[in-house]
A protein has these predicted regions:
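Surface-exposed extracellular loop regions of Gram-negative outer-membrane beta-barrel proteins
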Residues: 74-76, 129-136, 202, 206-250, ...
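Outer-membrane beta-barrel translocator domains and adjoining extracellular loop/strand segments
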Residues: 17, 23-32, 37-38, 68, ...
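One-face residue pattern on beta-strands with alternating periodicity enriched for small/polar residues
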Residues: 158, 195-199
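Face-selective signature of the C-terminal outer-membrane beta-barrel domain
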Residues: 3-20, 42-187, 203, 262-265, ...
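Membrane-spanning beta-strands of outer-membrane beta-barrel proteins
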Residues: 46-48, 73, 99-101, 152-154, ...
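Gram-negative outer-membrane beta-barrel transporters
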Residues: 164-170, 270-272, 291-333
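Small/polar-residue-rich segments within soluble enzyme cores
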Residues: 253
Length: 333
């Protein structure tokens, strides 16, 4: 981080990770459960990094921020039948992909008596390359073999107004966001992905607060879904009129703040999902397939699945302990 003067500063941050997985086929405990796990898990090798910079300009009570970043995920999944690599005939999956995202975000924070206004926009260009060879053993066995080079331009706008009472007893936040991209006509209109949201907080007594929130959120399906092709090179999910995933969410709970660096909360939540990708191969929503290992979404889908989730979440947060932040949570769904 570098401070040019009292009005201008620049911060640069980066990190990376490597995941080099191997299957323990020589374990002594070859129970039925372990045999099943070894039979379906592929060998996964991943490399990822993110590099970004934040420029801030302070003008009185207002703050202007410009954020640029680049991230990349290199992913390789390989699987042989019975984990026997002695013959290429045993190869059932060879998946190699690269996801690269270049992001630019501009934001202004305007401060007024009793409320703050955040407005901004973002522009992003993503590239997704994929080389897939996969044998699918369904009712009719088939081989999937294709190559994808997908470029995707994304854009968005957002605004949030935050009000805080003079005695700091009541806080309200009202915001709206809109996102779009050039993947298809179903996704390129900002108004089709309009996301309003509202959150309220009221201090009941002492350090105990009642919090509530409600909002609509949109999420882009995974790149594996966007970039899936048939063996003739056609983007099947684009032809299937793929859309953003929609989620309506509401939450209500209590929060205890014994100090400026400690928070404990209990919140009940309800989430409703629409336009979720549904597999056309086995009629199972992608959300029900699990994402622990392997490739998710590398298949033909339609945006027709619905769902819901509700439960209780307990959270504890400890801020700025020797420069560190600790968060512990338990969720019952």
């Amino acid at each position: 981080k570098h401070t040019f003067d009292r009005k201008n500063e620049l911060a640069i941050l980066g990190f990376g990770a490597i995941d080099d997985m191997k299957l323990n086929t020589g374990m002594e405990d070859m129970s039925e459960k372990n045999q099943y796990i070894l039979a379906y898990l592929p060998v996964v090798k991943q490399k990822t990094y993110t590099l970004g910079a934040v420029y801030k300009h302070y003008s009185g009570k207002n703050i202007y921020s410009l954020i640029v970043s680049r991230s990349q995920l290199n992913n390789k999944n390989i699987k042989y039948r019975d984990n026997d690599e002695s013959s290429e005939e045993n190869l059932t999956l060879n998946y190699r992909s690269d996801e690269i995202e270049n992001k630019l975000r501009s934001e202004n924070i305007f401060r007024f008596p009793f409320f703050r206004l955040n407005v901004g926009g973002n522009l992003e260009y993503a590239t997704y390359t994929n080389r897939t060879y996969q044998k699918q053993f369904t009712t009719i066995p088939r081989v999937i073999n294709y190559h994808t080079d997908l470029g995707l331009l994304k854009w968005g706008l957002y605004a949030t107004a935050i009000y805080e009472s003079d005695n700091e007893r009541f806080t309200a936040s009202l915001g709206v966001r809109a996102d779009a991209n050039d993947y298809s006509p179903e996704m390129n209109n900002l108004l089709d992905q309009l996301s309003p949201r509202l959150s309220l907080s009221y201090r009941l007594f002492g350090a105990v607060y009642l919090n509530g929130s409600i909002g609509r959120y949109y999420e882009l399906p995974p790149y594996t879904v966007l970039g899936f092709k048939d063996n003739q090179g056609n983007y099947l999910n684009k032809a299937n009129h793929l859309t953003y995933i929609r989620s309506d969410q509401a939450g209500l709970g209590l929060e205890y703040r014994p100090s400026s660096y400690l928070k404990f909360s209990a919140e009940g939540f309800y989430k409703k999902y629409d336009q979720y990708p549904m597999s056309l191969v086995d009629s199972i929503p992608l959300a029900s397939k699990g994402t622990d290992y392997g490739v998710l979404g590398n298949e033909a889908v339609s945006s027709t699945a619905t769902g819901r989730a509700y439960g209780l979440e307990l959270t504890g947060r400890w801020y700025n302990y020797k420069g560190l932040t600790f968060i512990a949570s338990y969720t019952y769904v």
